[in-house]
């Protein structure tokens, strides 16, 4: 049996919105790229280009260090 899967076209949100640089102070933007557990979602899932994925990782790590974002989930 052949397995059919629907693949949606992935696009880089940063190039679509013409964002030049990812900043750690944009917490609402960063939350879109973090899973429920607090992990950074990989580029193969989000469709982000490698250049922006590196900036995103650095920005998330800085925001975590400054307590703008949590390191893990809420542990409910």
From Swiss-Prot:
InterPro entries in the record: Ribosomal_bS18, Ribosomal_bS18_CS, Ribosomal_bS18_sf
GO CC term (a single one): cytosolic small ribosomal subunit
Pfam family, any one: Ribosomal_S18
Keyword rRNA-binding: yes
Family annotation (Gene3D superfamilies): Ribosomal protein S18
Keywords for this protein: Ribonucleoprotein, Ribosomal protein, RNA-binding, rRNA-binding
GO terms for MF: small ribosomal subunit rRNA binding; structural constituent of ribosome
Entry superkingdom: Bacteria
UniProt GO BP: translation
Alphabetized HAMAP family for the sequence: Ribosomal_bS18
Subunit structure: Part of the 30S ribosomal subunit. Forms a tight heterodimer with protein bS6.
Known role: Binds as a heterodimer with protein bS6 to the central domain of the 16S rRNA, where it helps stabilize the platform of the 30S subunit.
UniProt family annotation: Belongs to the bacterial ribosomal protein bS18 family.
Cited PANTHER family: 30S RIBOSOMAL PROTEIN S18, SMALL RIBOSOMAL SUBUNIT PROTEIN BS18M
Name of the protein in question: Small ribosomal subunit protein bS18
Species for this entry: Neisseria meningitidis serogroup B (strain ATCC BAA-335 / MC58)
């Amino acid at each position: 049996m052949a397995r059919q899967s629907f693949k949606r076209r992935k696009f880089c949100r940063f190039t679509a919105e013409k964002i030049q640089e990812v900043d750690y102070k944009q917490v609402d933007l960063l939350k879109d790229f973090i899973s429920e557990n607090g992990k950074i979602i990989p580029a193969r899932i989000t469709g982000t280009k490698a250049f922006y994925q590196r900036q995103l990782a650095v920005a998330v790590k800085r925001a975590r260090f400054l307590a703008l974002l949590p390191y893990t989930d809420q542990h409910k």
